[in-house]
Amino acid sequence: MAKTVFHSSIEGAQHGGKTLDEFVNFAKNAGAVGAEPSNYHLEDENGGFKSAIEIRETFDKYDMKLDGISCHCPIWVHTTAWTESKTIRPFLPKNIWTKSAIEIEAWTEKYIFRFLELSAELGIKIVPMFWGMSHGFEVATGYPFGFFEGPEYDLISEGNERFVNKTSGIRQKANDYGIYLCHEIHPNTAALCADDFNMLVTSCDDDPCLGVTADPSHCWEGEDFETRFRKVGTRIYAAAVKNFVIRSGLNLRSMT
């Protein structure tokens, strides 16, 4: 007899304006069997997280499966804070983003530790996310035209070392809990293509917690999804399936 392996589910990262109850209710009414809230849906009103019991009760209320919990923004901020970019501000409380880069990095690391602890309590093994700008904006944006190595500098090797050092605590926690941190290969992150991701894995001595979320809609810079996901296939633990069209003739990067 045939056995159902997959079920319909909804990613919650695009539903940040909803409460956890509103999001799970929305997913139920949309016809999904499960849902994946983001870290923000799980926050309480006191700067912490809801209890695992409260979260479970919300899903049980609607007879929905908890398929995972994403944590894109805090992890991106953690590996981007060193750049002192203002673009981390939308994802942080004002009393945090006004602090120094070192203080912001320390705060987000503690936040991520608490998030991973809660995820483990809920039995979560897969966390969709993306690493931040560990190698800097020059490398991630392609400027200045690939001159990533020059007199007394090597942005790639420096970035690899930075990634290893800054993520070591988070990776250790994930491994302790048996959680896979599934990076979405994506512009303006630590890995823009499959080769970049494999470089990170090598730099981290093949750390088993480093995974990939396969999302074909992110293949908009020339690397098609078959090329990308064959290269990182052994590291794929999550996937996102969407209706999408990559339109030709449009500039990917624009200031207007």
How should each PLM-predicted stretch be described?
Residues 36-61, 82, 131-138:
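Glycine-rich, proline-tolerant flexible connector loops at the mouths of alpha/beta enzymes
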Residues 11-18, 24, 45-48, 194-198, ...:
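Gly/Pro-rich active-site loop or hairpin
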Residues 74-81, 133-139, 221, 244-255:
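Flexible glycine/acidic-rich beta-alpha junction loops that bind and position SAM and/or redox cofactors
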Residues 2-10, 33-37, 66-71, 127-129, ...:
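Hydrophobic faces of well-ordered beta-strands that scaffold small-molecule active sites
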